[in-house]
Amino acid sequence: MEKRGLAVCISNAAVFLQYGETKILIDGLYKDLGRNFSELPEKVWESMRRGEGELSNLDYLLFTHSHYDHFYVPYLQEYLEHNEVKGLCLPPGERWRGKGHSLSFDEEGKIPLPEGITLRFLDVRHLDKQFYDVVNRCFWVEIGKKHLLFLGDGDYQEEAFEKIRGLPVDTVFVTPIFYNNAKGRKILREILGVKKIVVYHLPFPEEDTLHYERMTRRDIEKYGEKDENVVLWNRTGQSILF
């Protein structure tokens, strides 16, 4: 029987991937200290910290960068105390002395994982001039026959994304700010050539005080192209099967 893949929205920029028996979580141990987005749902975190449920004993934990709304050290420490994890990809520059094994990438920034999965990274600067000194690690995942690209809070630097021109990308995960910017949309269309776009890193609708959802829907209506499929992820459980 052919293996099926699954990508699931947890909250904010947290995405769970599963292919066969291999489980990966991206930016899933975080805390919204700035109160601009939504917290990791309490029931989800309680299960994780006890080593129970679908998000227990994840094989790989990946983090795009060191901001609290993507990576929260106390949560990682507690998770590792109660769960078995095969590998970590910590934020660039993070000095970690806790439990866990860091993944070793080759010179091309690539590493093979079980079940034919390939993980690759691209480092770009963080969005917003005040955060340009923060390195954001984008993750490209070849999983089954699909190629997923997670941009985290990556900035719209054409010269950075030129490094992965030609890599197949079936679905890209971007912030509403990236999609809102003309340079961001140019990267998606002309460099990455991607037709399925998931706008994530959004608060839950009832907590969206800055109206990110309204802005994004307006942008889709105004700037979207006929051959593009753009969807919003702002509820736990939204998913893609492949």
Placement of each model-derived feature along the sequence:
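Active-site-proximal loop/helix segments of hydrolase catalytic cores
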Residues: 127-191
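Active-site neighborhood of phospho(di)ester-bond hydrolases with catalytic His/Asp-centered motifs
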Residues: 25-27, 57-69, 88-92, 149-154, ...
